[in-house]
């Protein structure tokens, strides 16, 4: 279960970088795009991946959840069509659940025997409703795991003005959702996307333009 621990953004980035370093040491080759998140989850952390029907409340979309004691990431097979039509979504959700495993799961409880007659409930459901701090932290971990600085920075170092075609190019290279790329670049202070979807160099530039209208 979640320990409700506070994580600084730089701590989350460091934890993601450490996990990538462990994987690099294990396989003995340099990291390259896209980050092999399935192999990392299965071979390094020993998480298994399962597809089955997951219950959803009205007006709710549940994509996946984590069963820590069973070391399972369970994807909702009812949302298979959504995964198929959304580039990068499967990898994004899987890395998000890896983030929960690394940040929030008490590893001391993983190998404990379950209570007889009681099935383990899924935790940390990736759902469409309001996001908790645990969810936000897992998502930030995912963004640094799948879009690490050493692989991102050389691609954007000489870019002066970002546009959507370039962002979609990055999406395809890193194989994440387009929102991951957008938020990743926004957090680096390289752009700001307004409610209409227009890209600005910064939020300050957008606010200045808005005041002039």
What is the meaning of each model-derived region?
Residues 1-213:
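Active-site hotspot residues in diverse enzymes, especially metal/ion-binding acidic/histidine motifs
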């Amino acid at each position: 279960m979640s320990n409700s621990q506070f994580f600084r953004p730089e701590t989350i980035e460091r934890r993601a970088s450490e996990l990538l370093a462990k994987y690099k040491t294990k396989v003995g080759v340099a990291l390259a795009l896209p980050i092999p998140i399935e192999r990392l989850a299965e071979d390094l952390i020993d998480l298994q991946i399962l597809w089955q029907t997951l219950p959803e409340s009205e007006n709710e979309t549940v994509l996946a959840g984590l069963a820590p004691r069973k070391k399972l990431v369970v994807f909702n097979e009812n949302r298979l069509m959504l995964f198929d039509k959304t580039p990068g979504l499967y990898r994004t959700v899987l890395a998000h659940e890896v983030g929960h495993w690394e940040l929030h799961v008490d590893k001391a409880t993983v190998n404990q025997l379950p209570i007889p007659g009681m099935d383990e409930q899924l935790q940390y459901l990736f759902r469409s409703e309001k996001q908790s701090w645990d969810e936000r932290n897992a998502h930030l971990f995912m963004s640094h795991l799948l879009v690490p600085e050493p692989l991102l920075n050389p691609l954007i170092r000489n870019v002066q003005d970002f546009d959507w075609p370039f962002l979609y190019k990055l999406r395809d290279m890193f194989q994440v959702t387009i929102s991951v790329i957008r938020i990743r670049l926004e957090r680096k202070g390289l752009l700001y996307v307004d409610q209409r979807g227009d890209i600005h160099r910064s939020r300050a530039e957008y606010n200045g333009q808005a005041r002039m209208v």
